[in-house]
């Protein structure tokens, strides 16, 4: 499954990043963090800064809504910012793929001992979807498929994030006509269905 961010064509790619930042802020608020989105401090911009309400731990979050593979230097820069700002943790949240080198760094980092590993966490599509499911922000794609009552699903179901709502986009194959139709389910109101036919 993948996650796509959708903005009006008149808006900048910065707006796309803000959708992801806002989503991360919502998830952190659920986890008892006080959140500030997009702050500028000497020498850096922080997409999301959070401080835990109970234990006062601090968290810097770098959000990347890129379609191209994320380069390894993004990870190095985030880790440097965590150390420089004396934060307790850093999160890299990315809806796009990691480059080969970035995957290597992620793998190395996640094999460190628990104390070291706690300083940096990686949230790619699967982990973002898990957070959304566990927080109750979305229902599972399997639940959506059951509601659609079709036997011919394509495998590439997508979670589409917009400025205001989240949608599952489910390709349904029509074997009789050789077409694909897309059904979009609004997360908060399962009764509302929008169907777009692609010919």
Which residues does each predicted region cover?
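Mixed-charge (Asp/Glu-Lys/Arg
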Residues: 1-199
């Amino acid at each position: 499954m993948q996650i796509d961010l959708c903005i009006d064509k008149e808006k900048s790619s910065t707006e796309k990043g803000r959708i992801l930042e806002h989503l991360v802020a919502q998830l952190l608020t659920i986890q008892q963090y006080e959140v500030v989105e997009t702050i500028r401090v000497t020498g850096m911009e922080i997409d999301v800064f959070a401080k835990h309400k109970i234990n006062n731990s601090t968290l810097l979050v770098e959000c990347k809504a890129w379609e191209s593979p994320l380069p390894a230097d993004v990870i190095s820069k985030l880790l440097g910012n965590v150390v420089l700002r004396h934060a307790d943790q850093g999160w890299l949240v990315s809806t796009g793929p990691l480059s080969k080198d970035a995957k290597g760094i992620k793998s190395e980092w996640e094999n460190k001992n628990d104390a070291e590993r706690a300083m940096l966490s990686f949230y790619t599509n699967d982990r973002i979807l898990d957070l959304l499911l566990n927080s109750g922000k979305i229902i599972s794609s399997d639940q959506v498929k059951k509601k659609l009552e079709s036997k011919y699903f394509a495998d590439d179901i997508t979670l589409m994030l917009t400025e205001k709502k989240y949608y599952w986009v489910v390709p349904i194959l029509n074997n009789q006509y050789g077409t694909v139709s897309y059904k979009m389910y609004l997360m908060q109101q399962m009764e509302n269905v929008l169907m777009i036919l692609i010919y």
